[in-house]
């Protein structure tokens, strides 16, 4: 899993410039879902929804500072109860004291805070920017560096995952679920020269849709622009290209880390009976329509890669119907022979057929003042927010989402609106979000008074090499993938 990668920026989804050979190979051997959507175009809500199979509004993870209840069953709980070794290497953006949520083992710290400090406040005008709001800094300062926090982190994530795979190969007593979660290509975009130099600046195109005039932009886009200060910066074409160049380099960097993990899976002899699933928590606008980062319902922010590979179990293929990351949990359970609720895509992996079903996406965080939702049905995308006019796009005729068809399609909008009313009690949801924000702000004030609370995860020292209470020579012997039998001298110890 990676962070902030839109499907459209990968060659497997048609991009002609980005270099991602590891993901290309995975796509060639697996099933590519061409229209997969995140449950929310924001990190923590999307990840929590993926792991529980429930929308953010159903589990109370409204934003990046909302806590997933420890009592909420996750994919990891279900697999662990069935005997699986459940392990996480990398970020998952858990908030609160429970930093495992069913993972039996966690190999690294997280890369984002686990506290409540990033709680939005819908009562505050967007012009009063909170300190943690996205700014244009990442767009203005991308480039080459010898090292960065994000690359250091992802290097460690890959290394720990590779080591875990070797451990699993040595002891096959239990089936395993290993989640490897990288922070790239999330901004800031600062990469080592070998990744930056893979791209010629003349290859980097400008956005297909430039900055939309304020008089023509939808209200939510304007809110995001105001929140991040986009209109306060006049970007040159070279600056836009440089930011996109850095993002492409970040994709190549994380693709190489993914290749290391997949290579270790094969080297450990585990590839033939392991299902590999690749996705991202949300996308990246990357200057399209003048927007950057996520938090929007447009395709670059909401549509994510979803690739499932299990050579020998199902043939390579492509699925065009809309699906959701909410479908991952029931799919994984069915593939593992376990029961679960929700829409499983296991059948689609066999025959490519998904069936008709609306795909729902929510946004309940900073940048709105009331709940906003999106529905994808067939070729149409519908966006609803009580504060804004309806949006309706025909993605087959208008893939760049330039023409709002809502005024000319009242019957279709009425059908979508009825589905919104059926799925959500919007006044109650809005009140719940506001109440949650108020409660968390009080807790933040309390916990930042006196001795601050710290919920960040730190792997226990006893899990590290040569720090546990075991024989050093035996530990070193077992650390070899092709461990020899114990010598007579060791047996006598």
Task: Give the positions of each predicted feature.
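Formylglycine-dependent sulfatase
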Residues: 1-384, 390, 399-415, 451-493
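A contiguous, mid-protein "functional segment" used to position or interact
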Residues: 407-451
């Amino acid at each position: 899993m990676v962070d902030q990668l839109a499907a459209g920026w990968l060659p497997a989804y048609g991009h002609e410039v980005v270099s991602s050979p590891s993901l290309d190979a995975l796509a060639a051997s697996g099933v590519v879902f061409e229209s997969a959507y995140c449950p929310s175009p924001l990190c923590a809500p999307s990840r929590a929804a993926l792991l529980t199979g429930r929308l953010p509004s159903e589990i109370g993870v409204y934003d990046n500072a909302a806590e997933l209840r420890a009592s909420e069953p996750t994919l990891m709980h279900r697999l662990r109860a069935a005997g699986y070794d459940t392990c996480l290497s990398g970020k998952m953006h858990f908030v609160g004291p429970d930093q495992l949520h069913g993972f039996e083992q966690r190999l690294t710290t997280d890369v984002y805070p686990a506290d409540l400090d990033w709680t939005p406040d819908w009562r505050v005008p967007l012009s009063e920017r909170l300190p943690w709001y996205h700014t244009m800094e990442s767009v203005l300062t991308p480039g080459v560096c010898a090292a960065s926090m994000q690359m250091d982190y992802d290097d460690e994530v890959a290394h720990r995952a590779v080591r875990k795979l070797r451990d699993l190969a040595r002891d096959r007593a239990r089936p395993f679920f290993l989640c490897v979660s990288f922070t790239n290509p999330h901004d800031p975009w600062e990469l080592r020269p070998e990744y930056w130099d893979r791209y010629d600046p003349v290859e980097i195109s400008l956005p297909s849709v430039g900055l939309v005039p304020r008089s023509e932009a939808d209200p939510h886009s304007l809110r995001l622009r105001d929140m991040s200060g986009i209109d306060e910066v006049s970007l040159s074409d070279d600056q836009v290209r440089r930011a996109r160049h850095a993002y492409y380099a970040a994709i190549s960097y994380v693709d190489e880390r993914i290749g290391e993990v997949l290579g270790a899976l094969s080297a450990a002899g585990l590839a033939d009976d392991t299902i590999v699933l690749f996705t991202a928590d949300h996308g990246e606008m990357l200057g399209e329509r003048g927007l950057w980062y996520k938090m929007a319902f447009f395709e670059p922010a909401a549509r994510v890669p979803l690739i499932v590979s299990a050579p020998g179990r199902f043939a390579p293929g492509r699925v065009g119907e809309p699906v959701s990351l909410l479908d991952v949990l029931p799919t994984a359970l069915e593939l593992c022979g376990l029961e679960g609720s929700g829409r499983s895509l296991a059948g689609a992996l066999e025959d490519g057929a998904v069936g008709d079903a609306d795909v729902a996406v929510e946004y309940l965080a900073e940048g709105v003042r009331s709940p906003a939702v999106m529905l994808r049905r067939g070729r149409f995308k519908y966006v609803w927010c009580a504060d804004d006019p309806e949006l309706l796009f025909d993605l087959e005729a208008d893939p760049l989402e330039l023409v709002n068809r809502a005024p000319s399609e009242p019957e279709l909008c009425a059908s979508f609106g009825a589905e919104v009313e059926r799925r959500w009690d919007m006044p109650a949801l809005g009140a719940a979000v506001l109440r949650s924000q108020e409660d968390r702000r009080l807790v933040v004030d309390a916990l930042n008074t006196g001795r601050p609370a710290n919920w960040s995860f730190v792997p226990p020292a006893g899990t590290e090499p040569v720090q546990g209470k075991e024989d050093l020579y035996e530990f070193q012997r077992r650390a070899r993938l092709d461990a020899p039998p114990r010598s007579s001298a060791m047996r006598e110890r």
